[in-house]
């Protein structure tokens, strides 16, 4: 896979829960847009800190080219901050709403933070990742900020 979407848990206490699924129309649009640019896309929804850390580690092992990371409730978790420092590829931090915190500014190879656009934040983050990978131009007529 070329692009991995990692979605963190809603809470990081004894009551952790995975994030709600992306709406099918949003997920379908993401997969279509990535495919249009010659990339593949996979989504990993994580219900715990351990699952997020494992997904980040595997992203390096699998040779992922870019990650869209929604840390959920883990933005202040030191293990997550350390794990993103170890990513061998760029990532875009994604948040559905503006009231979620962000990872520290100098955390790893972060390209941008996209927040406050609901599920649309993922589409905007994907465009940023595709631009960084040099494959934003394709037969799809989608341009963000250009």
What are these regions (language model features)?
Residues 18-36:
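Short catalytic helix/loop segments, enriched in acidic residues and glycine
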Residues 64-102:
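Mid-chain, well-packed structural core segment of small domains
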Residues 1-16:
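Short beta-strand segments enriched in small/hydrophobic residues
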Residues 51-55, 76-79:
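Short acidic active-site motifs
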Residues 37, 87, 106-109:
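Short, structured coil segments at secondary-structure junctions
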């Amino acid at each position: 896979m070329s692009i991995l979407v990692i979605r963190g848990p809603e809470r990081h206490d004894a009551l952790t829960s995975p994030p709600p699924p992306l709406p099918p129309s949003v997920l379908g649009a993401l997969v279509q847009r990535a495919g249009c640019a010659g990339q593949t896309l996979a989504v990993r929804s994580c219900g715990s800190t351990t699952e997020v850390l494992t997904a980040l580690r595997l992203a390096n092992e699998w040779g992922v080219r870019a990650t869209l990371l929604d840390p959920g409730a883990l933005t202040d978790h030191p293990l997550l901050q350390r794990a993103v420092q170890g990513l061998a590829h760029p990532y875009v931090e994604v948040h559905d709403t503006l009231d979620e915190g962000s990872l520290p500014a100098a955390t790893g190879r972060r390209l941008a933070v996209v927040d406050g656009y609901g599920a649309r934040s993922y589409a905007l983050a994907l465009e940023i990742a595709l631009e960084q990978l040099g494959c934003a131009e394709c037969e799809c007529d989608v341009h963000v900020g250009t």
